[in-house]
Amino acid sequence: MRTFDYKKIAEYSWDNEVLSYVAKIHECKGRQELYLKQRPAELERLVEIAKIQSTESSNRIEGIITTNARLKQLVEDKTTPRNRDEMEILGYRNVLNLIHENYAYIPVEPGYILQLHRDLLKYTNLTYRGHFKTTPNEINMTLPSGERHVLFRPLEPYETPGAVEALCCTYQDVLHRELVDPLLLIPCFILDFLCIHPFNDGNGRMSRLLTLLMLYQNGYVVGQYISIEKAIAETKDEYYAALAQADQHWHEEENDPTPFIKYMLAVICSCYQDFE
């Protein structure tokens, strides 16, 4: 069984690229409060735009789509879903709203993660919503020949509850003791979450929602105004390439999370630059 211990991150020697990203984001966070006070009317408009973009982008990454007109109506609660895709889009909108409004009261714990997953798939009739996976879920790609190639084998279903519990415990412990900068800790958590792949469906969307939740809880609220999900969707190839590099030898606990950390820091940094 793979173990999780984020205290090790404190011992890493980070290169100048990582340190530069972290410093820039800290500077942006320092100016954040000033912008929030100076531009209330403009920020309200940005929030509504970001909600639509985040809902559309995070679902589009997974091939879940609808028309722009329908999307806007769904996000603004002016219509009901017509099909499975729209059910999942509406579920994402609801969880996104919940995180925006209540992030301070949603602990990063297995029970709450399960509740968010249940709410994500609330409008579907899927029996596994709100439950960890019950069958193995390989991450595959289809070759031009039509042959399926296994990219990554996540943990088995029987390992999943304990792994998510351990993941949450080490995250909370290291965060509480202030051993590691949250900007480094959060991408490590998300990488491990994706490698566990704890659900039958919805892992990618849950990872992006949890990213927002943890960023907001640590004072990085740019995602409320500039869509982080849109930034990821626009750099999807880089996203998957960073994941593929960072999950090598993950089962042996010899993987290097740096490529994924750099990718996520670049995304957060670009969102702050757009915000300013």
Regions found by a protein language model. Give the residues of each.
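FIC/Doc superfamily catalytic core
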Residues: 1-276
